[in-house]
């Protein structure tokens, strides 16, 4: 009988059932208990017999037999001797598989330190003993003695003595008066002698006493390690090894190659070194060799063991014969090729194939074309079993032959096997879950896989040679999941934003667009048709054209379910399109009675999905695809070079811009503007010109042309392609027929001279050269950024992988407030789009009538959002993942709608991974898309505010002055202009820049499009608030101010230079003061002098003695020249935000509300303090480098959270000062801005899920009576548990603040050490986990994949739940039995059967 079958019933090692895994330091006893024998010899196998040497590294006596059930000498063979130990060769007769699990050990002649606990920073041994790593190494490597027991001598405990000092001390105090040792033995004794309880108490006392922050931190670190050893059951001396375990031989195999040579695992070499040195040391000790030789041997043994555990961490890397570093045990786990990432998290699978893909337009959406040859190979086992079942073959061999000969009956059987058996298609790179989808295979001839055109956008596939892999789900459960969850027909919506992803593109869009065009004056205009037959007849007999305006009787079912008839004005093409639309009262003909662009089609699909359900949508999609292809082919659209129309006004615009640029040049030569300002203005002028030419071109291309008979001519084909969204964009058309415009240098700056030609006219040599910059940069960027994007996705997945929907509702009353996002007066994200599919955190009421629109706790659907919009609600509080109160995972209410299904989210959905994929996937796509516009520069600098509504002006914090030129100027930074509609609702608010010209005032009525304010975007002014005479302070020629002569103009301009770097300039405080008629410095209205401090690089606009009025400009600070905004700023920016890095020049934020006061300067920093408005708070002081521009004056009032120094705020500051909600809003907005710039839609909830994971830790501020240490970071779960325990025992709980961790840090500090170790820094994670005796509860996805279980998400989540219920029932039954046994001790065994409690 087959051995394997026998072994099913008595496996060599029983399968283990476990709920958690614990890791700790192995004690010598533990290592010996694992071992099956000591390895005494370094030999591996005998070179003649090829049998393993006894007591060697492959010894059969220790590790088990080489062949199944056969001892080494061959005396006992076969199953019947199972378990016997041969008396000749001492080998147990058993399965050879035990060679994979039996371990051995090496008994060391001298103890050695474990390198991970010694060298992995921070050094655990060093921290416990409070010694530096340098000192430890000196002891370990036999340079210095350490005093263990000073006795009555003057020596101190743990004092280091060199050889001479040691001998001198022995002479001085006598041989036995003190104990000092050297080497690992000494450190082992020190560790053994530690009294952890005593040290713990001592450290806590010291921490209470110390005031120094640094010392407190140092003590806290040491205390943490002491506690780790106290509570984990690890003993400190176990960090020094006396026994080294040897891993099973089949995990470090020796494989014979042809030609009599062997390939071996590096570990064997490393073990051999250890054994050789150990044996030599034993021999030297027996021979009583001189001390110096023994010490050298011990040092070499330490080095050998170090190399075995972690080669290259200390000293030189040990290399093999071919100068290649040997792979140590640590290297086996680390990195992409290590055990975790190569074998445990990413396995290769059988039953798969790959081939090139071609388009399959006649397939249905749920089908894919599978080549017959491929199917035959993939489904072989199924075919064999079916052949056997049908009696066509009796043995596997026969079946094999039939299949190889490809007999007709085999093809019939293949058809049966494949029917209803889905296969998975995958296209690399799999950036999100739609990169693997299930299809039903259709057998085809040929060797290429056929793919349905509509799923291409989900796979990001095209047919230019892409390849795809096919996988076969084998088990019934796998087939079920593939069909129900992964079928392409079940993935119509994009998980990132809930929009349809099965959308037509390219040819299909063009065909549908062509079908829906309406033109005036075509033959048959105004005819009326009663039904489709008539219409088709007229079309075929050419009485009417597809685009003719006609009237048609449309039969339709209204909301009440009655049949109604409408007379429509439409075109023949649109009627044909209307035939495929599902009949539903919610889908009137108006949905498609318009020009169908890609956007419109996507909208129609979305509506069909929401109103008619999934099945109808799939049918509809397939039908419009066929229609689109057919009409694109019928239309026969093509284009020639005359279709690219160069606008007639092009040269006029170019000439006028050239004149303008000359003017700027002249102004610069006259010294009116600086070089930077000239550059900005020229670039601005040219980008405006480019836009204008593009506009003109679009106007001419899209213009309606009339034929001689008055009918409209065919639309320009290039315009059709771009306008429909089939191919090309206005930006590309501009380059073809307008002007290419400005180009960027590789550094990102814009070249001042634009490319005036377009591709139709052809570029001159110089223009061509200028344009190569941008193109080349685009290509280089792509290569670099694809990698970065992949790495970002990996970090995101890692931080969010254990975020799963675990409950329906956590019942929290917390939430975050949502408003529309307005950028520069235009709404970039409406309130409706942000709250759709979220749960209301409180009742949403109509502001006018106060009636409830949405109840608290209800999911907001499309109709609710529409109602909220109609009511004019400005702000809605919603539930969010950030405020969900569940300990593990997130609840369904806080998450809201599952975007990919359009229904409330299911229990067990892995929302963390979906969030990570949704954020990471466009990253890669964007990086690949940078160069499409060929580096053509895109500038957008907003410097005008126009009203978007009619209404009345309300100004908050009004401060307006009329300057010398008669303009109204904003004098403060926090002035806000709001536009209010007649019933008092705020429609828009605009923050007005300091120094902006304001064109309206309080109470004015404005019309839509009216200009409210404008400013110069390239400079920041410093304005005067009083009328008087200018005087300078500390503005000394060549010390704090320099007159620079512009070489090209000969005009001088005065710029403030860095005065600290000049001689004697350290105490200067350059300023402009304004004096009255009496020559004294004037006072400002709010107190303080009229003294305006200047920062480096300020350009003076006034002279001494000049008269100024309020609102006049004293000086201006030029801002950076405009860089192109490209995703280059994008990806690194997203990574920076998720990693929560402090920006380089971070903004300084006011921590309290109060009044600004300037204090005495400190070295080269300015001292600024805020006197609080609230008397209970303490004043705050800030030191600000002198070069930074502080735009506040003495006596200004700031609000909590206002910027004192401009810049990007550090997210940690926002969290500390304004709290979680503000931080979330900031991160969500900043990240969304990057994606919005690229036109990528991502739902806010995905970013919220990631931010939630970044906020899982709490920093203890006061430890109370708990065991936590103030200053340490604790997991939220642990924090709450320990505090609950403290409250229960009547003790004082600890307090703490949430801390924001970057995603990498958060991943490494997750509760699961498996997850962290498989992410990065494996050594450090495992060392720390072992010292703490960490327990991995196996809650996340990664840990479960690593231990080889179903993940606790999706179908795995329900399995886990069922298991929980079963355990509970079993417990109940056992408890019941125990009770009964207690009541009736001598009852008969036939107790009545227990009734089972109902399942939950």
Swiss-Prot record:
Residues given in the record as Zn(2+) 1 binding sites: 71, 73, 86, 89
Entry's Gene Ontology molecular function annotations: DNA binding; DNA-directed RNA polymerase activity; magnesium ion binding; zinc ion binding
SUPFAM superfamilies: beta and beta-prime subunits of DNA dependent RNA-polymerase (SSF64484)
CDD domains: RNAP_beta'_C, RNAP_beta'_N
Cofactor: Mg(2+); Zn(2+)
E.C. no: 2.7.7.6
Family: Belongs to the RNA polymerase beta' chain family.
Function of the molecule: DNA-dependent RNA polymerase catalyzes the transcription of DNA into RNA using the four ribonucleoside triphosphates as substrates.
Record-given protein name: DNA-directed RNA polymerase subunit beta'
Organism name: Rhodopseudomonas palustris (strain TIE-1)
